[in-house]
Amino acid sequence: MKYKNMNITIDVTSKCNLRCKHCRVNEIRYDMTLDEIEKVFNKLTDFKPRGVFISGGEPLIRDDIVEIVKKSKKLSPVTILNTNSLLLTENKLKELIDAGLDYIQVSVDGLEEQHDYIRGKGTYRKTIEKMKMINKYSNQIKLHISSVVSKSNIDYMEKFVKEILEIEKINVQILGFKRFIPNNVLKDVETLGKNGLKKLYQNLEVLQKRYKEKTIITSDMPMKNIFNEKQAIEIMKKYNLDCVGCSAGVNGISIRNDGTVTPCTLLYISCGNILKQNLKEILQNADMIKIKKRELKGKCGKCKYKKICGGCRAAAYQILGDFLEEDLECFI
C-alpha cells in the first residue's frame, strides 16, 4: 500500500486560550516535549509528507513554537500553522516567517454574531485585527481562513465571504469551508443533515465562480468529487493514491499531543502511538487498512463512488458509532 505524500496534522498541545463550542480538542493533558516532536518528525522522514499542519489546542501557547516550525521545515516543503490568531504578536509572526512557516490558517466561523457565538464575545473583531497584521507580511507568508459551516451560519456564507474580502488590509489566499462534524455539545442543534450538506455544496459552487478572481474558495467535503469525477481520478493518478475523497488514513493522518495516531483529527480511534512504534507499523493497523481499502458499510459500501468519495468517516463515527458505517448526511 502507498503511504507517501501524506498530509500530517500534529497537535502540539491540548491547551487553548478559547473554549469553542464545536471544538474537537481532547482531554489528553500530556504534551510532547520538543525532543519528542523531533523524534516524531524523524520517524516521518521516509514517508516524505506533502505538508505538515501544526495544530492543537492553540499551538501559539507553546513557547517553543518557532523551534517546532524549524524542525517541521526539515521534514516537509510546506508547513501550516492552524491558529485562532489571538495570541499572535508581530514579533512572533516575524520569528515564524524567519523559521520558514509557509501558511497561517486562521479560524473564522462566519460573521461577527455567528463567530462570537462559537468562539466567545469579542473574538471576531480581535481576529480581524490579527489578520490585518499578518497581511502586512503577505509577500512572505500566505493567509488561509478556515470556516466551519453549521446550521447557525450556513445561510450567511456569501455575506461572510463578501465581508471578509472587502475588509481593507486583508488578502486571503484561500478561504476553506469545513462541514460541522457532530460532537456531544452541539450534535442536535448544529448538525447540517442531508439538506444542509446539499446546500453547503450548492453554496460552494456559486461562491467559487462568483469570487474566483479574488480568492480560492475550497472545501474538504468528499462528496464534491462525485460531481468532478474526472478531476478526482486525475489527482489519484498524479499522486499515486489508492483513493481520494475522505482523506482519513488515506492521504492524511493525525498525531495527537501525546503521540497517539488517529486517521483524522476528527476521528478519535487510536491506531497506535508514534512515540512507541514506527509509522509503518501503525499504518498496518487493522482499522487503518479497512479505511484505506474502503471496507465500508451501508450506502457508502455499495456506492460506486466510494473510491473518490467514501463519505466522512468522522461523521459516521460520531453519529453511528462506527467509522465504517455510511455517512447519514449524504445527499446523493
Place the predicted regions along the sequence by residue.
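Cys/His-rich metal-chelating microdomains
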Residues: 15, 19, 23-26, 249, ...
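Radical SAM enzyme [4Fe-4S]-AdoMet core and its adjacent flexible, acidic
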Residues: 11, 32, 78, 98-99, ...
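Residue-level preference for beta-strand/loop junctions
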Residues: 4, 48, 139-141, 246-247, ...
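Conserved alpha-helical substructure of the radical SAM core
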Residues: 1-103
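Flexible mid-to-C-terminal extensions adjoining Fe-S/redox cofactors in radical SAM and related proteins
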Residues: 243, 260-261, 265-332
